[in-house]
Regions:
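Short, well-structured active-site flanking segments
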Residues: 13, 29, 41, 47-66, ...
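Short, contiguous, pocket-lining structural segments
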Residues: 128-135, 149-154, 258-262
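Short beta-strand/turn segments that mark the catalytic/cofactor-handling region
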Residues: 310-312
């Protein structure tokens, strides 16, 4: 199953969907896990606080969350977190999936775990940037709900101030009606990627890298991961494969960094607003000043010694 939606200068110009497996329940408004696209929504949420004068990117997290200072995290600022430089790419304790439900987030079940977690940095200062694949969203959520005057979770903010006003299907934490519209994820697996990499590009190869390039990149990633996280646990209890994201309890919880659900139409609509400077038509997601600060002064660094990145 796949969807594609493209806006050009604020106008929707492409709106496609299809089901290669002839799924009768799949359509343009089906919801799909968009994984790390949710990280952009985290950035919008934090930028909204900055735009309202409730936070700055230089604010240390413990200023708004005093208990966070445990384990030597007292100097970590909001910008460090957003740049994947908080030293919390993994946790020592696997999270219970029910702790991700909004009511349990507000009861500080997840927050208390983060408060007691020591940061893990690699030795070289130049390689402090490590991909917080799932954990960044959890920490951002804790910061956001403490600063937001209404005490909302990120999913609640998104529904009330972004997705709702735009009528855009982008959700963090699904309800009963939304669960009925979800299309399961089906991983292709490394074998499919490897087989596809053998096809020459002139014959329509569907993956970017050829076999040898793919193997070189995979080897570097695997060796780096083993060096950094050889003893790390799964981020969530009983999570043994990517299929765990199809679990209903997981879908109901808030993991913004890796478990946001959207239609292509919804995600593209929000992207169009951001491409227009934070406002499109009568709906403003961010003030222009907040939008400018969000994109100011990108900092280059290697992500885990593998991938060159530039984050503001």
């Amino acid at each position: 199953n796949a969807q594609l939606c493209v806006y050009h200068r604020g106008i929707k110009v492409v709106d496609l969907w299809c089901s290669k497996i002839h799924d009768p329940n799949f359509g343009a408004d089906s919801l799909i896990n968009v994984f790390s696209s949710g990280k952009s929504l985290e950035a919008i949420a934090i930028a909204s606080l900055v735009g309202r004068g409730l936070l700055t990117y230089e604010t240390t997290i413990c200023e708004v969350w005093p208990e966070y200072r445990g384990g030597g995290k007292e100097h970590t600022c909001v910008a460090d977190l957003m740049r994947h430089e908080a030293g919390l790419a993994t946790f020592d304790t696997a999270i219970a999936v029910d702790d991700l439900l909004p009511e349990n987030i507000k009861a500080n079940r997840l927050g208390s775990l983060i408060e007691n977690q020591d940061p893990h940095f690699r030795s070289a200062a130049a390689t402090r940037r490590e991909y917080h694949a799932m954990t960044r969203g959890w920490i951002v959520n804790e910061v956001f709900r403490r600063v937001d005057p209404a005490g909302r979770t990120l999913g609640e903010y998104l529904a009330e101030e972004i997705s709702g006003p735009l009528n855009a299907d982008v959700v963090v934490g699904l309800n009963d009606a939304q669960l009925r519209r979800v299309s399961d994820i089906t991983p292709l697996g490394i074998r499919c990627h490897i087989l596809a990499s053998f096809r020459p590009k002139i014959f329509g190869r569907k993956v970017l890298h050829n076999f040898f390039q793919l193997m070189a990149r995979l080897l570097k990633v695997v060796l780096t991961a083993r060096k950094n996280f050889s003893a790390s646990k799964p981020p969530i209890q009983n999570m043994r494969s990517i299929n765990f994201f199809n679990d209903e309890r997981m879908r109901r919880g808030e993991t913004p960094s890796a478990n946001t659900h959207a239609s292509a139409r919804g995600l593209a609509h929000i992207a169009a607003v951001m491409a227009a400077g934070g406002q499109l038509g009568s709906v403003e997601c961010l003030s222009r000043s907040a939008w400018d600060l969000l994109h100011k002064d990108p900092q280059p660094a290697s992500m885990g010694g593998v991938l060159p990145t530039r984050f503001t």
